[in-house]
């Protein structure tokens, strides 16, 4: 996935996000360990608005080519998708279809909840309350945020601490989703789980899933990822998105 303007790849992992946020320069090794840690450092130095402004510029203002996996999702249109990326490609995949959007938020005093709820009517988003959710619509869950329709992100260490605390307390998942997610199985694609933040978020979001929680596609998984998959009940498949799409294409042709 690259910028339509200059061909630069979209920042899609921790290292590339840190480099983009810091003007292409690496940060100290302890800060390069994980994006939230680096984001916290720059937030303390440059103010709380710095990181959201960077993410807006990166994911709202720059237009990118489409990824193959999102083209497949646009064709398949599953009823429930969790996307921990902060770009808008998943939302673009559902741009011609009504859906519910759940966006994670953090460090707010106006509400005890750590999410915003929107309904998309085929043209635009409008904010709704939990009791107004139409449960038969597809559900897009963006726990780490999105610039659309309103910029909200979980990015720095402080964001993650607040969000995960409320996630564990039940305040980051809408009530209707707590019911909807029961006994589900998940397919984890393009999601490294070698950092504590992502593991904690996914562990709680997939709570109440089927005993066989699903499938975790990861080439060259770390020992931590193997233990995580085994502990939660994910079947580990040593493959990546490209392998997955090639297998789908092979079956389609057959």
PLM features per residue range, with description:
Residues 1-254:
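SIR2/sirtuin NAD+-dependent deacylase catalytic core
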């Amino acid at each position: 996935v690259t910028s339509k303007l200059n061909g630069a790849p979209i920042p899609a992992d921790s290292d590339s996000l840190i480099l983009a946020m810091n003007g292409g320069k690496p940060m100290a090794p302890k800060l390069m360990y994980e994006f939230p840690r680096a984001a916290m450092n720059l937030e303390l130095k440059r103010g709380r608005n710095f990181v959201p402004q960077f993410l807006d510029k990166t994911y709202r203002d720059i237009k990118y080519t489409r990824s193959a996996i999102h083209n497949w999702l646009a064709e398949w249109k599953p009823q429930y998708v969790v996307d921990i990326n902060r770009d808008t490609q998943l939302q673009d995949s559902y741009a011609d279809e009504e859906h519910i959007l759940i966006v994670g938020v953090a460090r707010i005093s106006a509400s005890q909840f750590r999410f915003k709820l929107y309904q998309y009517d085929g043209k635009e988003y409008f904010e709704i309350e939990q009791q107004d959710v139409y449960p038969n619509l597809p559900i897009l869950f963006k726990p780490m945020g999105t610039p659309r329709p309103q910029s909200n992100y979980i990015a720095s260490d402080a964001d993650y601490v607040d969000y995960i605390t409320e996630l564990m307390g039940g305040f980051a998942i809408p009530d209707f989703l707590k019911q909807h997610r029961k006994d589900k199985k998940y397919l984890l694609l393009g999601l490294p789980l070698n950092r504590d933040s992502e593991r904690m978020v996914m562990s709680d979001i997939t709570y109440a899933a089927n005993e066989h929680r699903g499938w975790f596609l990861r080439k060259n998984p770390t020992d931590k990822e193997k233990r995580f998959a085994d502990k939660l009940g994910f079947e580990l498949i040593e493959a990546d998105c490209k392998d997955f799409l090639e297998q789908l294409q092979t079956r389609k042709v057959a």
